[in-house]
Amino acid sequence: MSASPSSTEPGIAGAASGGASARVQAVQAPVIPIVAGWIRETPGTISLGQGVVSYGPPREAIASLASFGGELADHRYGPVEGLPRLVARLEGKLRDENGLDVARGSRVVVTAGGNMAFLNAVLAIADPGDEIILPVPFYFNHDMAIVLAGCRTVPVATRPDYQLDLDALAAAITPRTRAIVTVSPNNPSGAVYPESALRAVNDLCRARGLFHIHDEAYEYFTYDEPHVSPGAFAGAAGHTISMWSLSKAFGFASWRIGYMTIPEALFDAVNKIQDTNLICPAAVSQHAALAALEVGRPYCDAHVRVLAQVRTLVYSRLATLGDLVEAPDARGAFYVLLRVRTALDPYVLAERLIREHKVATIPGPAFGLTSGCSLRLSYGALAPDTVAEGIDRLVAGLGTILRATA
């Protein structure tokens, strides 16, 4: 049975002899490929692991590709920050849906997905050795980007319901702190932060001279809770960096289109970073994104209504485990972050669930949860009937394993 993966302590000799840099070795091993390897070795596994949706792009986005490629300009490098017509369309979307007027001190930059937007932000605002505060549980790619940039992740525990602990966030600030990160709706917990909490974080960042980085990739995936964009708060433009992705809302995961709003003062820095790493977002993906945005939010909303029903089923099945697990109510995204009452290592439990019960989840340590045993399950990637079968396997597997090890 595999042990929990950990960073390798690099040495000078290792780097000098052709090994990876100390900076890269310090980054946590990506968890998705680890779990994917176990799944490949166990045919027939139902994956409640990776955070993707079960649907693809709107047919209008695919149909739009027929009109792409006929002009020589379609095959040239485009603007670093994205095609002007897509940037303009996003500015309208942000104004109409998020209440964010980018004309008041912000700029829009199109990126190759939300992860690039986050790395752009970190590289633009932080120097090696600087600190960035991540509420725990955190999205593992955020931690990976911070460490890759030579900075330090400062994990701060959330409350038992995975809501922000504002006092703890304030107490974690040091002279090296550059930003506080929030993700709402949250990956991995599914928590939706209320306006009061996000406003408090935004005000704290402004008062202490920090940036507020806010990830809104799951903005449409809420269940009876409003979504809030801190960038729309009065006075927020100068210190707020927000980011979005088309991967979830429009089924665009492989097309790699995201976007970010940044203070005007950071525009040149972000463009320099993106020009170095990407040159420009792929024109064909931007072309399809324009068509998807014309279809708009109703496309995603129809799928969210189905997910709401699946969510109800997931919680009802998990309830049959009684006090073996705790599943805090998640009002957003398509995740449940289970606390499992066991002394088993989370990676060991996750691997056993795959090999013995053919159902995959993601171990909690990938999200910064270093005490206890937690598993994240995703119910967004599969058809409702398949999710039901996967949850039944998970419930049966947890019941069998936990009762045998009690």
What residue spans do the PLM features occupy?
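Conserved glycine-rich beta-strand-loop-beta hairpin in the small C-terminal domain of fold type I
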Residues: L290, V306-Y315, A327-R339, S371
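Conserved core of the PLP fold type I
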Residues: D74-D203, Y220-A234, D392, L402-T405
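Conserved core segment of the aminotransferase class I/II
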Residues: P5-G14, G238-A308, R317, L398
